[in-house]
């Protein structure tokens, strides 16, 4: 199975950028290596957050995390509007706050 890259984006609620920045700089609430990922990164713009998952089953890993880590999902629901959506890439102007590589 080839390495997969799965990128999701979520729109920040007004006034939540600083809180999101602190969360992202702290890194993920899980161990990417234990999940079989080969890369994981977080990016931020003025109004959106981007999460990048890389590995053999990146998409299914990201979806499983969303289902299993409900406390973390609930915390992010206070910072973002609506549901995250898959996007093709992180925009060039986004600032990388976290980057892990195996």
Where are these regions (language model features)?
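Short glycine-/aliphatic-rich beta-strand segments at the starts of folded cytosolic domains
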Residues: 2-14
